[in-house]
């Protein structure tokens, strides 16, 4: 989505990562009802629009097995970049001289910083109960929602330096590419054309080398065949000369 001027915030990136982790772990999570708890103590308290999500049951052995799969980080990276695209964040995949693009930068960031141990710990933090306690008199609680899923994972990620490094890196990468394509649109086009031109030139050189190789092989085979014909012709000439001499 080149040319987008949208800025991706640290909070938004954290939510995207936590949502992606949750989605990747859904096979290990089942919903359980009846474990959430709301306690209201005191007089004159008013609660309006207070909701609780269903609690979660987590299979920790499933989580451990899942995060250690060879393609887990790759799938997670794909999920994150797809979520970035879905939220109208500039994901340009413009090419530089080294053929690196935004998605590659994000993948490398995740592989370096977002370890399977960290992911496993944050997903495991889903276990337990949601508790909302209101004490005292005259309290007003409105539009309170307890979320036990992406938000808990998000809070866990914000407490880890590695996760913060990942989130910061992805945010900066997205904003960097977004700024590049929006503020330097013609430079972006020029770079893309230049990259394509370089690829064409490389392909042309390869084709020329292949043609030269074919010519060299053809010349070698042709010369060899001609040399063999000359060698076969020499005895015939000699025999003809001898016959002529004998007749004379």
From Swiss-Prot:
Location relative to the cell: Host membrane; Virion membrane
GO annotations of cellular component type: host cell membrane; membrane; viral inner membrane; virion membrane
Residues on Cytoplasmic side: 2-199
Coiled coil segments of this chain: none
Residue spans, topological domain Extracellular: 221-248
Quaternary state and interactors: Interacts with A151R.
The protein's name: Inner membrane protein pE248R
Taxon lineage: Viruses, Varidnaviria, Bamfordvirae, Nucleocytoviricota, Pokkesviricetes
